[in-house]
């Protein structure tokens, strides 16, 4: 029933875009990533700088839930995908929101990533990371721009999950 009402509201707002835009503020920013040297033949300074350079993350999904922290049963109120330059934007009514990435939408992340011979998981860190999301924002009477995020690629672990540490052997 809840899902039906959510779809009904979304359909109404989509059918009347001028009404939906009224009273909203635009939230926008850029998402970037940079790499790390992960062993093997030592790179030249030029190659190392190239690896560590910030690059836009295209296709990165940002989800929005109402409230100041992520809750499992909270509904997603908006989402957006970064463009080829890593830019994203969405329109929100005044209020408090938490921004999330895909891995923070449900608690499967705790089953997906468990400690192993080569990965160490900080469970307290994972709980806090899941709860806090990417960030929380308060939307008032003005738009929020330059809400930027940067991910440093660490060796042999997923890019955007900060609570994992590689403890295995590095390539010679």
Enumerate the language-model features and the residues they cover.
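Short, ordered, surface-exposed loop/turn motifs in non-cytosolic proteins
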Residues: 34-75, 94, 163-164, 171-172
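A short tyrosine-centered beta-strand micro-motif
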Residues: 93-101
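A short, amphipathic beta-strand motif
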Residues: 25-33, 39, 149
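Short, surface-exposed beta-strand/beta-hairpin micro-motifs centered on an aromatic residue
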Residues: 83-91
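Short beta-strand segments within Ig-like beta-sandwich modules, predominantly Fibronectin type-III
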Residues: 78-82
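Sec-dependent signal peptide recognition
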Residues: 1-9
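Bacterial Sec-dependent signal peptides at the C-terminal "C-region" and cleavage site
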Residues: 8-23
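Structured interaction patches on ligand/partner-binding surfaces of diverse proteins
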Residues: 105-152
């Amino acid at each position: 029933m809840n899902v039906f009402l959510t779809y009904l509201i979304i359909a109404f707002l989509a059918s009347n875009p001028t009404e939906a835009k009224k009273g909203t503020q635009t939230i926008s920013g850029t998402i970037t990533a940079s790499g790390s040297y992960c062993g093997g033949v030592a790179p030249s300074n030029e190659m190392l700088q190239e690896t560590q350079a910030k690059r836009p993350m295209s296709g990165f999904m940002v989800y929005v839930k109402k409230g100041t922290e992520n809750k499992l049963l909270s509904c997603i109120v908006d989402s957006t995908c970064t463009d080829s330059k890593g830019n994203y934007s969405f329109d929100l009514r005044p209020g408090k929101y938490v921004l999330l990435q895909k891995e923070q939408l449900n608690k499967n992340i705790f089953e997906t990533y468990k400690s192993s011979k080569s990965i160490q998981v900080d469970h307290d860190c994972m709980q806090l990371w899941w709860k806090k999301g990417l960030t929380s924002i308060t939307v008032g009477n003005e738009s929020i721009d330059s809400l930027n995020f940067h991910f440093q690629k660490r060796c042999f672990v997923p890019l955007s999950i900060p609570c994992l540490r590689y403890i295995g052997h590095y390539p010679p």
